[in-house]
Amino acid sequence: VTLGRVQVTDFRSLHSAILQLDPVFTLITGPNASGKTSVLESIYLLGRGRSFRTRRLDHLIRHGAERFVVFGEVDAGGRRIPVGVEGSADGIRAKIAGERPASLAELAIALPVQIIDPEIHRLIEEGPSQRRRFLDWGVFHVEQSFVSDWQRYQQVLRQRNAALKARQPRSVVSVWDADLIQYGLRLTEARSRYVELLVAAAAPIAQHLLGLSLELGYRAGWSKDRALPEALDLSWSHDQEAGATQVGPHRAELAIRLEGSPVKDRISRGQQKLLAASLLIGQVKLFPEAGVQPTLLLDDPAAELDDQRLAGLIGEVANQTVQLIVTTLHGEFAAFGNPGRRFVLEQGELQAL
């Protein structure tokens, strides 16, 4: 799967931009605040249905416009599949091959896209939900049945939480327990399998970039000394008090250790970035084994990295089987080879070179 033509209209500072992307390597250069990150953000939106920078939809619409439109043509085994996303005051609307998808997960099937940007340290620094989202996106592409189990679990969880919030008796709340347990265990098993694959892929990268041994573990979201049915039963009083379900895979955590010690608050910002990059590149590394070629967006890789660390990061990215789209202030990166397509962006105007 590769992304070919992309057309962006009224997205952030971009009034109108058209890119014909190279299937291997596209380079976008330009000064700071020229809109380079916005181009990557629009491509990310095509594959995710959301921004990696903001939850505020109105921030994505160019000042004075009523909506933005991002359109792309995906080449999937010789078939061209049009994919489009439109955002307005009414929300996000997507189309794949002219049809409205049943869920935004279908965008991820049509265009698997991941990003490494200057904010990737948030994957390490912020709370467990960031890491659950990272895990689930990876599991979905390795085990595509995962998304239906995830959606069903979320539906059951919402219904159970609504009953708890409404102070319904235990006999009413427990109606949802069997499905919560069934789908919760499926998610847990799939995530656990994926973490084993991920650490095998990411540990050598972390060793190269950080010079430290990486270990990953999966904490299921309830005590490891109990089965989920027992944990759910014992949590009843806590659930009542909180008005929400307190155990289950929605409370899971990806445990990360370097040299045997938890990483939280123990490593520098630069190390956080390289650790997060190791996980993201490790995730991308697993895609070809599942028969998928992802699009990898690399935004300003030189930001806050010294020459040695930058060379290591670029070398690891260059080893992956991806469609690569890179933004930078100027220049090229020899490890990637010559870009098949190159664009320069200045003051919101994009030109092919």
Predicted feature descriptions by range:
Residues 1-31, 45, 170-182, 186-295, ...:
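Conserved NTPase motor "head" modules and their coupling/switch loops across ABC/AAA+ ATPases, GTPases
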Residues 18, 93, 113, 295-296:
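Hydrophobic "anchor" residues on beta-strands that sit immediately upstream
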Residues 36:
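Conserved lysine of the Walker
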Residues 44-130, 136-146, 196-204, 214, ...:
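Nucleotide-state sensing region of NTPase/ATPase domains
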Residues 122-123, 129-174, 178:
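Long, charged N-terminal accessory/stalk domains
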Residues 299-301:
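Walker B catalytic acidic pair
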